[in-house]
Curated annotation (Swiss-Prot):
Outcome of gene disruption: No visible phenotype under normal growth conditions, but mutant plants exhibit increased susceptibility to infection with the bacterial pathogens Pseudomonas syringae pv maculicola strain ES4326 and pv tomato strain DC3000.
Residues that bind ATP: 90-98, 118
Name used for this protein in its record: Serine/threonine-protein kinase PCRK1
Family: Belongs to the protein kinase superfamily. Ser/Thr protein kinase family.
Native organism: Arabidopsis thaliana (Mouse-ear cress)
Entry-linked Gene3D superfamilies: Phosphorylase Kinase, domain 1, Transferase(Phosphotransferase) domain 1
Keyword Secreted: no
SUPFAM superfamilies hit by this protein: Protein kinase-like (PK-like)
Lineage: Eukaryota, Viridiplantae, Streptophyta, Embryophyta, Tracheophyta
Gene that produces this protein: PCRK1
EC number: 2.7.11.1
Catalysed conversion reaction: L-seryl-[protein] + ATP = O-phospho-L-seryl-[protein] + ADP + H(+); L-threonyl-[protein] + ATP = O-phospho-L-threonyl-[protein] + ADP + H(+)
Induction trigger: Induced by infection with the bacterial pathogen Pseudomonas syringae pv maculicola strain ES4326, but not by microbe-associated molecular patterns (MAMPs) such as flg22.
Catalytic residues of the enzyme: 218 (proton acceptor)
Length: 418
């Protein structure tokens, strides 16, 4: 059987390698219709088939598309990053390294702006393709929930060809970081809802609001960054692909991505659609709810795969509370959390055609945010630390009495990719 290429996580220096994959779906089509009634919205099951509806099928050359981007010299970026010093390194992985730096503002040379400089590792053709992809996509798209690409550099120096990208600096790091034990900051429930909303807006723009469709293909919490106001923005488009051409339902491609986020039909067939991103978004919602990673080998065996772990707890409210992120310390409206889980469940239908489009997902999330805002001023600034969270402990304002809100669960299958 064909082996599929995955990245097994965000470990430092980890390269994509063939691995065996086991993914399970949460819902059957019938169950998704039942859970969706929470929103009093039209049934979206089975109504969506992917078509580009006239979207373009090829990209113009980088040189014509990158006209809005600033071209940096390697000297500029060495100066900006203290010669790529480890003292200003803010990220490292199989793709290369990211450095914090400062560059002069083009409109006012006396003003310096903070930037993030991504130095791609020397991975031959694949590394160059991912660099070109980022320049192609981010050179022409602009949205408040996408990290802005400011410029690029492709230049030879004593170490050979250097491929670099320069982004707006995102001071509050990634959502993945703040959900991990490494962070002393606690993302409040209100802020998690806004992050879910921001991420849905970004994906909706990519899928539906341009003349061509972009499929992210590597949607995950480590690729969702937070600006100084804690607004979430999607980043890292090196694996992104154009959506299907007119008249086609999917793109056939090598299977790449991150363990725990890839849709089962994509793993099995290599057929990529925007519904693959919708699946990944559903996984991400359970990350926000539980504070856990999709795959965590450091946990006990029965808790290592997030979707498998949550499944037994979803049948009634009392059990459901046991999967909520303990760092929230009970400060959430339980109905709000349940409704977000319903959205996640819609995204995790095994039949990809029965999953909602991202615009429909966004509409559902918007309703949850609006209802949450109606309960008082939302707490959008995270708590400073776990201790501060304990000191501010209050009563759980959630309610009970909604046993069976989830419905019967689908019996999962194991899918082996190799």
């Amino acid at each position: 059987m064909k082996c599929f290429l995955f990245s097994g996580g965000d470990k430092r220096g980890e390269q994509k390698t063939p691995i065996s994959v086991s993914l399970t779906s949460i819902f059957s089509d019938r169950e998704i219709n039942r859970s969706g009634s929470e929103f009093n919205s039209r049934d979206v099951s089975g109504t969506s088939t992917e078509s580009s509806m006239g979207r373009k099928n090829s990209y113009p050359p980088v040189s014509t598309r990158a006209s809005n981007l600033r071209e940096f010299s390697i000297t500029d970026l060495k100066s900006a990053t203290k010669n790529f010093s480890r003292s200003v390194m803010i990220g490292e992985g199989g793709f290369g390294c990211v450095f914090r730096g400062t560059v002069r503002n083009l409109e006012d040379s006396s003003v310096k702006i903070e930037v993030a400089v991504k130095q791609l590792g020397k991975r031959g053709l694949q590394g160059h393709k991912e660099w070109v992809t980022e320049v192609n996509f981010l050179g022409i798209v602009e949205h408040t929930n996408l990290v802005k690409l400011l410029g690029y550099c492709a230049e030879d120096d004593e170490r050979g060809i250097q491929r670099l990208l320069v982004y707006e600096y995102m001071p509050n790091r990634s959502v993945e970081f703040h959900l991990s034990p490494r962070s002393l900051t606690v993302l409040t429930w209100d802020l998690r809802l806004r992050i879910a909303q921001d991420a849905a807006r970004g994906l909706t723009y990519l899928h539906e609001e341009m003349e061509f469709q972009i499929i992210f293909r590597d949607f995950k919490s480590s690729n969702i960054l937070l600006d100084e106001d804690w607004k979430a923005k999607l980043s890292d488009f090196g694996l992104a692909r154009l959506g299907p051409s007119e008249g086609l339902t999917h793109v056939s491609t090598d299977v790449v991505g991150t363990m725990g986020y890839a849709a089962p039909e994509y793993i099995q067939t290599g057929r990529l659609t925007s519904k693959s991103d919708v699946w990944g978004y559903g996984v991400f919602l359970y990350e926000l709810i539980t504070g856990r990673r999709p795959v965590d080998r450091n946990r006990p065996k029965g808790e290592q795969k997030l979707l498998e772990w949550v499944r037994p707890y979803l049948s009634d409210t009392r059990k459901f509370k046991l999967i909520l992120d303990p760092r929230l310390e009970g400060k959430y409206p339980i109905k709000s959390v349940q409704k977000l889980a319903v959205v996640a469940n819609r995204c995790l239908v095994r039949n990809s055609k029965a999953r909602p489009k991202m615009s429909e997902v966004l509409e559902m999330v918007n309703k949850i945010v609006e209802a949450s805002s109606g309960n008082g001023s939302p707490q959008l600034v995270p708590l400073n630390s776990v201790k501060a969270s304990r000191d501010a402990r209050g009563k759980n304002n959630g309610g009970g009495g909604e046993g069976g809100w989830f419905g019967k669960l689908w019996n999962p299958k194991t899918i082996r990719a190799c």
